[in-house]
Amino acid sequence: MSRACALPIDAAGYRPHALHADRNVWVEKNCYIDIWIEVLHALQLDPLAVLACTVAIDFEGDQFTFFKPPHQELWELYGVDVQELNVWRPLLAHAQEHLARGTLISTEADAFWLPDTQGTDYRRQHTKTTIVLADLDLGRSQLGYFHNASYHTLQDEDFVQTFRVGFAADPAFLPLFAETIRFERIARRSHGELLELARPMLARHLARRPASNPVTRFGERLAADWPQTQAAGLDYYHAWAFATIRQLGAAAELLAAHLNWRGDLETAAAAFATISTGSKALILKAARSVNSRKPLDASALLGEMAAAWQRGMDAIGAAS
């Protein structure tokens, strides 16, 4: 079988979801939430319903929570079933098997071989990310896949390297983590039905919210660590900023979108939008500080963001 396709999509004509439009503060959030936004969108489902998890992100010492949509909520909202794939044989063989059965595969991948990362990682540096395999054409050595903010294709050498085609067996090579995404029992619910399911999900995640203000704690850690972070240079800074500021800002933007989608928590949504835009200002301000070696004074900005976090949480709590 030359071609195995679980979801036929024309990459050239694909239009990403509005959450990935250029008008967003954070066009790309993190690799896992991004693929789910686009997979659900491609399945003609509304990803705004599954974003309640973002209310619970916390500052965890050296990073903010790398937030992901809970698999149980994907099942309850949409009838999409996610399970770990036991990668006991080459990934290409699994892809042929499962895509032919109409099952998508999410898998870790090396961004060095992903052409959609042109200008950043592609053919420049080896970076772990997550993609979703959708359309495999073995005869043409071509793959259609979801990654970051859209749907793309790769082929030829990128295909060979992604799937290790022709590589000798290497007992030291550990298989990449992968999951199957089954949607044969997809549930196409109305907006009202999704709202009824999503409300208790937000309440459950709210119960897991940080016990103290995570933006305040992050500001304290930033001030303590900044001399070392600044001295480590831009490469270190970019990795640190992705793990911290970007996750905070992207989660806040998605939470604001979810709350606006609900239609009854606009005050809270505005507060989290303030955190999102503040995070973008901070990430740029901090980059300039690293580049110029000048001091970073972010106390006022972080104070505004911390106050916005408290306002937002208070508003959600009052409505619950």
Range-by-range predicted roles:
Residues 123-131:
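Short coil-to-beta-strand transition motifs
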Residues 137-244:
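Noncatalytic regulatory segments and standalone regulatory/sensor domains
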Residues 44-48, 154-166, 226-230, 261-269, ...:
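Hydrophobic/basic alpha-helical segments enriched in Actinobacteria
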Residues 2-89:
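A structured, charge-rich N-terminal accessory region that forms the first stable segment of a protein
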Residues 24-40, 65-69, 191-192, 204-222, ...:
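Active-site nucleophilic cysteine motif
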Residues 78-119:
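Long, hydrophobic/aromatic-enriched structural stretches that serve as scaffold segments
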Residues 246, 252-320:
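Charged, long alpha-helical assembly modules
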